UniProtKB/Swiss-Prot annotation:
HAMAP family, sorted: UPF0149 (MF_00346)
Source organism phylogeny: Bacteria, Pseudomonadati, Pseudomonadota, Gammaproteobacteria, Vibrionales
GO annotations of cellular component type: cytosol
NCBIfam families assigned to the protein according to its UniProt record, in alphabetical order: PRK01736.1
Name of the molecule in the record: UPF0149 protein VP2588
Annotated PANTHER family: UPF0149 PROTEIN YGFB (PTHR37528:SF1)
InterPro entries from the UniProt entry: YgfB-like, YgfB-like_sf
Database matches in Pfam families: UPF0149
Family assignment from sequence similarity: Belongs to the UPF0149 family.
Length: 192
């Protein structure tokens, strides 16, 4: 059985644009990761009406765009609930200076929409652990970051990679506290 992976960034971007949906792949992924990390159920379709309301004034998505979103949701749910502690981010993979700017902007979009997704899932942060509060505070700061045109691009690319890894750690920290878990496949003992 082959493992399902996130769709390629450019193909999903083209599909979202052709469907006239004003959301980027990074924003879509951030929103879904945020909703899942906020405790949204992983075994039903309750995420779709929330997505439609947030991105398309409550209107459903065209079939192909929705299929991309379903794939992103499924891959993300599997990663977040798996034992590997790995998280893939749906970010552009372009080279050069323009690619670095696009990557930084997309990371900011992902983080902003992750935070929105947490809100849409309705988590109560007042009872959150210090670790979760710190992770969220870090994400709020990361959302404001950008690339300085006057600094060394090679150094900034390395720093951005470190920031991306920190974003993943923050997301996993928040999901560990608030995220939904898959229902156990182990059957409970029958008492006679």
């Amino acid at each position: 059985m082959s493992e399902i992976t996130l769709p390629e960034y450019q193909s999903i971007a083209a599909e979202l644009q052709s469907a006239s949906l004003a959301v980027t792949p990074a924003e879509l992924h951030g929103l879904l990761v945020g909703m899942l990390s906020g405790g949204l159920a992983i075994n039903d379709q309750t995420w779709q009406p929330i997505l439609f309301d947030y991105t398309n004034d409550g209107m459903g998505w065209p079939t192909t765009a929705l299929a991309f979103a379903q794939t992103v949701f499924k891959v993300t749910a599997n990663e977040l609930t798996g034992s590997s502690m790995e998280l893939s981010l749906l970010l552009p993979d372009e080279s050069g200076e323009e690619g670095l700017f696009a990557l930084a902007d997309s990371l900011s979009d992902f983080v902003n929409h992750f935070i929105s997704g947490l809100g849409l899932a309705g988590i109560a942060l007042n009872n959150a652990s210090d670790d979760a509060k710190e992770a969220l505070a870090d994400l709020e700061e990361i959302a404001k970051l950008g690339i300085d045109e006057d600094d060394d691009f090679g150094e900034q690319a390395q720093l951005l990679e470190q920031v991306i890894e920190h974003v993943k750690a923050c997301v996993l920290t928040i999901h560990a506290e608030f995220g939904a878990r898959p229902e156990s496949s182990e059957s409970k003992p029958t008492i006679h």
